[in-house]
Amino acid sequence: MNASQRVRVAVVFGGRSNEHAISCVSAGSILRNLDPRRFEVVAIGITPQGSWVLTDGDPAALAISDRQLPEVTSASGTELALPADPGRSGQLVSLPPGASEVLASVDVVFPVLHGPYGEDGTIQGLLELAGVPYVGAGVFASAAGMDKEFTKKLFAAEGLPIGDYAVLRPSQSTLSLQDRERLGLPVFVKPARGGSSIGVSRVSSWDELDAAVAAARDHDPKVIVEAAIAGRELECGVLEMPDGTVQASTVGEIRVAGVRGREDSFYDFATKYLDDTAELDVPAKVDDEIADAVRELAIRAFKAVDCQGLARVDFFLTETGPVLNEINTMPGFTTISMYPRMWAASGVDYPSLLATMVETALTRGVGLR
């Protein structure tokens, strides 16, 4: 394949959410692994304020260095915009919009955005309006997968095993006595629409609840309170192929007991991205019967949310079997992320994994489907 036949891929990263830095790190890893013989890459960063910037795509600028998190700024490149006009499909133009100089033209977008204003259906809606194919879930699945309440409702509607939970809407300050009795202790308090364990607290006494709710509301006015589930933390990757078939990866396990000297530790932001203290087992040391059950549930969860492209599904393995925790419609792609690791253990290397996602997006196209 010569250069003129390469697929032009816009890797979009950063964004307005509190997962901005992790999106940058994921994008750096993807930029390193997209096969240059097959793909011509355009790297587009979104600042925390929402400006789109055409960058040079240097992966080194998107890495965590000395515990310093990367960030897209207006100085990272040239500001641009994506017109919501299908007639200009894939054209990225300069600002101000009146100038309309075409800075780049792309065939497909890889939105490596984590959290609200990116992974939640917002950029997917923009790309649908603009008539540009994109990697990953559509508007509905992205929105439902981002909101933990509606993810659980969709899982439950399909008869999938989930844990107990309660939702605190903006008008509700705390849990009712009935909810406290039903959930028991400990509980985990989380922003309903967030990821990377940002704003998550483990509550062992009801005296700690108000502070935990306040911490979650620093990131989302809607809060979910989940009953703690005793069990091992398992994960499974799901990948849609260009022909529409869906496959599940080797199962992985995250072991976090006692990190940083605490028996009540969990897989929080620092453990995931800064401290390098969690232990990741790929494949997980579980019986084949359990692994098969997890893979089957992962595919059922993927279909329950009407996902497309890819997802990572997280579980707790309890004494009575696997319980679904959540689905990530755009999982992390950092060097320590489980999704590419699990597929590598399944015989799909990183460049091939990315190529499959892009090919699936192009095959799917745009519009209702």
UniProtKB/Swiss-Prot annotation:
Residues binding ATP, per UniProt: 180-235
GO biological process per UniProt: cell wall organization; peptidoglycan biosynthetic process; regulation of cell shape
Note on how the cofactor is bound: Binds 2 magnesium or manganese ions per subunit.
Binding-site list for Mg(2+) 2: 326, 328
GO cellular component: cytosol
Keywords attached to this entry: ATP-binding, Cell shape, Cell wall biogenesis/degradation, Cytoplasm, Ligase, Magnesium, Manganese, Metal-binding, Nucleotide-binding, Peptidoglycan synthesis
UniProt feature coiled coil, ranges: none
GO molecular function: ATP binding; D-alanine-D-alanine ligase activity; metal ion binding
Recorded superkingdom: Bacteria
PROSITE patterns the UniProt entry points to: ATP_GRASP, DALA_DALA_LIGASE_1, DALA_DALA_LIGASE_2
Entry's family note: Belongs to the D-alanine--D-alanine ligase family.
UniProt xrefs under PANTHER family: D-ALANINE--D-ALANINE LIGASE, D-ALANINE--D-ALANINE LIGASE A
Function: Cell wall formation.
Protein name per its UniProtKB record: D-alanine--D-alanine ligase
Organism: Mycobacterium avium (strain 104)
Gene expressing this chain: ddl
